[in-house]
Amino acid sequence: MSVQVVSAAAAAKVPEVELKDLSPSEAEPQLGLSAAAVGAMVPPAGGGDPEAPAPAPAAERPPAPGPGSGPTAALSPAAGKVPQASAMKRSDPHHQHQRHRDGGEALVSPDGTVTEAPRTVKKQIQFADQKQEFNKRPTKIGRRSLSRSISQSSTDSYSSAASYTDSSDDETSPRDKQQKNSKGSSDFCVKNIKQAEFGRREIEIAEQEMPALMALRKRAQGEKPLAGAKIVGCTHITAQTAVLMETLGALGAQCRWAACNIYSTLNEVAAALAESGFPVFAWKGESEDDFWWCIDRCVNVEGWQPNMILDDGGDLTHWIYKKYPNMFKKIKGIVEESVTGVHRLYQLSKAGKLCVPAMNVNDSVTKQKFDNLYCCRESILDGLKRTTDMMFGGKQVVVCGYGEVGKGCCAALKAMGSIVYVTEIDPICALQACMDGFRLVKLNEVIRQVDIVITCTGNKNVVTREHLDRMKNSCIVCNMGHSNTEIDVASLRTPELTWERVRSQVDHVIWPDGKRIVLLAEGRLLNLSCSTVPTFVLSITATTQALALIELYNAPEGRYKQDVYLLPKKMDEYVASLHLPTFDAHLTELTDEQAKYLGLNKNGPFKPNYYRY
């Protein structure tokens, strides 16, 4: 009889371990280990690093027998004392082993007392063929159980709750479920409403790192500047977004929300929002059809029509233009966060089709110089490490695009010892890259030699099938821009190429000659699909979004035309000032004479609109 003791999580990474019953004479010379030592070599089920099992602490190891410490003391039949396995395996002239009739062993002490020894099974560790054992597994695997068996899902590791609250074996689409929150409402669609408690913990943790939004809640307790606002949102649904949504609710707004990315939703957070009464329609792993269905459920509601739009990527705005253009008669404005969405707004404006004012949050100072730079500088490493476990030192990396996102990625990888190349179309950004110590190249020049390719452009087909064909074996390909169009993933879905899902959000695309590339998040946004982002930095962006909504909603008629605007400089400075107390920072104040000399108001704004930070 053989018993497999390797956990499912470790099965794909280490050879299978097979334990066989052996006779005492066979076990002693082949193993010679105590039970504690054997236990230390076997990976624990469901946790730990299966490739590097830690030895038992010294305090837990059985002491090695020495002079004067024979097995007599260890095997004495004292009440409540369990003999040590290492001592039991040694023979001693003062003790004799006797067989019981039922096959058990007895210990005979010098005074003739017979004590039944605890029964043990001698085990020999043998290594089975990994490939053979893995192939014995059932071929039908749940949608996410394979990723769990290979590695703890990186994308579900935002919280400890995710690992034991996710319904990984439940193949039922959330659209087919009948769920209600504790108040009896069913106006939502999430993965599992029972995850709400764990999502609430995530939100409460995020609140501690989002001081400006919490300050807005306190300052607006009486006036409710968004009273009457009906906001429809399409953003990443994370704990940070939940804090923003609840802040908007505290300011008087009604909200309905969908996700702007099919992989970035935190299921437990979506459940917590639904439990709190927010109509949320999102879950991790939506299909393309699910994505548009969720957006439509937010917009197409009997007896409820939005008058404000908060978008990230422009998909929500596009859907309303396409399906419900008459809604814009009551919509006061659009707030757009991403470079992709802003680009689409400018296209509408240029074509004369933008029928409401729009606020460009992406190009505000507080978004560009903080979220785009500092957020990406930290999260690029987090996303790559969680999905690939790779070492960055000495790796050759090409970063496509040297805007604020590209700058953050390059700085992080350079600091970790990577050799970084940059591609860029803008001579100003290109010169910045050169002055920062990066070599400016065309992608074709380095595509055969680099270990990692990262896109940060907001453009389409930056990495084409030709580039993918020329990449070296095991090259990692990922995207830090908003859209999934930067990498031509569609060109890889052909019969001659094999796709192999090796862990959550990690695919190996295999060529006929055996070459493979490692594609992360199917070309979608790496950091929000595969890891997480710094909450404090997102607090800056979320506060900017909230103030932009307040500004557009309360602006007198005629202040904003049917065009795209930047947030007023005074509001940028206000957002920054709300975050300074976290660092115990103290601003210097201008004297009247200094303010007059500079031609400034003592309370700001301190820079003209044309100033580049």
From Swiss-Prot:
Pathway: Amino-acid biosynthesis; L-homocysteine biosynthesis; L-homocysteine from S-adenosyl-L-homocysteine: step 1/1. PROSITE patterns: ADOHCYASE_1, ADOHCYASE_2. GO terms for biological process: one-carbon metabolic process. The modification N-acetylserine is found at residue 2. Highly expressed in cerebrum, cerebellum and kidney. Also expressed in thymus, spleen, testis, ovary and, at lower, levels in lung and liver (at protein level). In cerebellum, expressed in interneurons. Residues 137-146 have a biased composition (Basic residues). Keywords: Acetylation, Cytoplasm, Endoplasmic reticulum, Hydrolase, Microsome, NAD, One-carbon metabolism, Phosphoprotein. Residues 1-14, 35-44, 70-80, 147-166 have a biased composition (Low complexity). It is found in: Cytoplasm; Microsome. The gene is Ahcyl2. This is Putative adenosylhomocysteinase 3. May regulate the electrogenic sodium/bicarbonate cotransporter SLC4A4 activity and Mg(2+)-sensitivity. On the contrary of its homolog AHCYL1, does not regulate ITPR1 sensitivity to inositol 1,4,5-trisphosphate.
